[in-house]
Amino acid sequence: MKYALVTGGSRGIGRAVSCKLAEMGYFILINYQSNDAEAEKTLQLVQEKGSNGEIMKFDGTDPAAIALALNNWASQHPDEYIEVLINNAGIRKDNLMLWMTGEEWNKVLDISLNGFFYVTQHLLKNMLVKRYGRIVNIVSLSGIQGMPGQANYSAAKGGVIAATKALAQEVAKKKV
């Protein structure tokens, strides 16, 4: 069986990607942090597409929570690995820089940029050992050109874009 993890998979883009991967025959691991009902709805939609999945609730900004959830999954699936990772989790807390709080800045970067790092780093070793993996990072035009009121979001998405380019150079020869 082929497994795909979609962070922020309970709604919006994450839900749409989960459904598309389900159509492609993947077992979908739907990550989310807070909205149980929406995660259940995404799981139902995945099943309606003829595939299956499971809900994987963890805080993508907490390395210990990520490790616990993914290690638990791995111990229940010792002969399997997650071959597709969709880093989709992210939030916007728009505000002009002049009035932006440190919390608004840090929360956006923590979820979008640090979450990408923590989850990707955890899954990367198995992809490299198996010599196959796909990592798709959902970003925004805001990460390329910046948008007023989105200094935090632009910085986070721009960071993911740059990290994606660097990571590709590190792992492409290993078919990841």
Each language-model region and where it sits:
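Substrate-binding pocket helix/loop in short-chain dehydrogenase/reductase
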Residues: 82, 96-97, 104-109, 135
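Active-site loop immediately N-terminal to the catalytic Tyr-X3-Lys motif
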Residues: 98, 145-151, 173-174
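Conserved glycine-rich cofactor-binding loop
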Residues: 10-12
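The beta1-alpha1 cofactor-binding region of Rossmann-like NAD(H)/NADP(H)-dependent oxidoreductases
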Residues: 36, 57-69, 102
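Alpha-helical segment proximal to the catalytic Tyr-Lys
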Residues: 125, 169-173
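Residue(s) in the substrate-gating loop at a strand-loop-helix junction
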Residues: 140
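Active-site helix of classical SDR
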Residues: 120, 156, 164
